[in-house]
Amino acid sequence: MLKESTYQTPCGTIHYWSNNLSLDTTTLVFLPGLTADHRLFDKQVEYFDGKYNIIVWDAPAHASSWPFRFDFDLFDKAKWLNGILEKEEIIKPIIIGQSMGGYVGQAYAQLYPDRLAGFISIDSAPLQRNYVTAVEIWLLKKMEPVYAHYPWKLLLKSGTEGVATSEYGRNLMKEMMLVYDGDQHRYAQIAGHGFRILAEAMEKDLPYEIKCPSLLICGTKDHAGSCIRYNRE
């Protein structure tokens, strides 16, 4: 059974869930993707609970980690994650990041290269600058108005059907999106800000070297962005 806790930052309060079994047990840190929340990993948490230490969060400004000022970048998220790990006395975790969560994991590896026991990327892509074009970076910075003006019902439909093939997966994504029902402005802010800080992290042109054992997972039916192409390269 996971316990809900909070972590204070200058921009707001982060909510996270953990089951710290013992300091000698391996810790799995689950990081959901952009606009998703901790429920994304419900099935994985259910499977691994009791076998590993587990930490999963609602990312800054997402779901219960609100209100939150959009005055942070990808590296701030990685630093706050490290603060949570230090608070829970966790050393050498395995980070498991889906999409945006995978980018947070890479930023963490850049800042703390010797603190990871492993890194698993799920439908994410490399942060290295050479993988993206200047046009792609420019587009990433311009996404907020798209999400703000896209009809909500169509966004809900494309957002659920485009990210999963199973009924469970689509229903779960719909539930997570419905957190923002009636507040599309907040949803657009989260998405727009997320893409923007992703572009800025790429522009830093850092090595983003993963020094620990790593596993790249990309679904054969994943058509989000250029994920398959990036991982193949």
Roles of regions detected by a PLM:
Residues N130-V132, Y150-E209:
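Conserved alpha/beta-hydrolase catalytic His-Asp/Glu region
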Residues G97, G101, G105:
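Gly/Ala-rich beta-loop-alpha elbow adjacent to hydrolase catalytic centers
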Residues C11, I55-G97:
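Active-site loop/oxyanion-hole signature of alpha/beta-hydrolase fold enzymes
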Residues M1-T13:
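N-terminal cap/lid segment of alpha/beta-hydrolase-fold proteins
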Residues K43, A107-L111:
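Active-site signature of alpha/beta-hydrolase-fold catalytic machinery across serine-
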Residues G12-P67:
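Conserved HGGG/HGGXW glycine-rich cap/lid loop of the alpha/beta-hydrolase fold
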